[in-house]
């Protein structure tokens, strides 16, 4: 299934693209705060939108590896409330980043934080046994030991270890191509061994630009379809702004309604 990403400020434009192209089958909607849910409810209450399939990108600040108990519980309760409030839409899946922690603490007790992420996810899956969760690779420019916060989920081994510990078919991997380009990591073993979806966006490997396909050069329609054929992703999300999404859709020659 091919979908497009949306945030509250461009949801209306993305809904228009959904209605224009029959090959766009769902919208992955990013939620950070309550007003984002209100915007989603407003648009989904309209008769013409009742057939739109939705998936949810959980808040970017969701921190599955938080080690301060009070903050961890608050984080969990907030995420749980979001899932509860959008459950009437029967989302295809929920996507999340793993979070962040002090670099020195993470490198000295790595397995402890992977276990914390697992416990957070398993707790959600117990509370909501019918949902599917995908965990997304991210990038970090921090490359040496320091007291700074580092992003968790930049390397394939982190996901391999998490999925081995979790051993749960409701948990999958969201491969963000743009993040992998910046991080310069090969996630092929994770994708091949676990249920995986794709966030499709491109960049020049220096910043998270969220560029789309081009008609010439390296990243063309051929590149896209070879990637899809190679890995057989469960879901594919064009994680692009409205104009770049439309350009990429036209390059892919997706069918209109």
Residues covered by each model-derived region:
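Active-site-proximal loop/turn and secondary-structure-junction residues that shape catalytic pockets
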Residues: 8-10, 31-35, 58-62, 98-102, ...
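Active-site acidic/histidine proton-transfer and metal-coordination neighborhood
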Residues: 71-171
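Short amphipathic alpha-helices and their capping/turn segments at secondary-structure boundaries
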Residues: 36-50, 78-89, 116-126, 184-194
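Glycine-rich, phosphate-binding/catalytic loops in enzymes
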Residues: 21, 45, 72, 111-113, ...
């Amino acid at each position: 299934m091919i979908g497009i990403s949306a945030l509250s400020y461009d949801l209306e434009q993305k809904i228009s693209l959904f209605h224009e192209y029959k090959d766009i089958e769902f919208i992955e909607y990013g939620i950070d705060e309550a007003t984002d849910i209100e915007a989603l409810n407003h648009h989904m209450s309209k008769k013409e939108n009742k057939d739109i399939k939705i998936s949810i990108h959980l808040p970017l600040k969701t921190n599955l590896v938080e080690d301060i108990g009070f903050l961890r519980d608050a984080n969990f309760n907030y995420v749980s409330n979001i899932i509860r409030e959008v459950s009437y839409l029967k989302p295809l899946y929920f996507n999340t980043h793993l979070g962040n922690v002090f670099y020195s603490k993470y490198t000295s007790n790595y397995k402890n934080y992977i276990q914390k992420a697992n416990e957070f996810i398993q707790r959600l899956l117990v509370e909501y046994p019918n949902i599917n969760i995908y965990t997304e690779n991210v990038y970090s420019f921090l490359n040496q030991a320091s007291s700074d916060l580092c992003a968790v989920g930049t390397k394939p081994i982190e996901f391999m270890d998490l999925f081995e510990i979790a051993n749960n078919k409701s948990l999958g991997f969201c491969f963000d191509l743009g993040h992998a380009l910046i991080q310069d990591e090969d996630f092929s073993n994770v994708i091949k061994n676990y249920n995986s979806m794709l966030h499709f966006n491109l960049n020049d490997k220096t910043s998270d630009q969220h560029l789309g396909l081009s008609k010439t050069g390296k990243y063309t329609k051929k590149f896209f379809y070879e990637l899809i054929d190679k890995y057989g992703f469960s879901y594919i999300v064009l994680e692009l702004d409205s104009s770049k999404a439309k350009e990429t859709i036209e390059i892919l020659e997706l069918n209109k309604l």
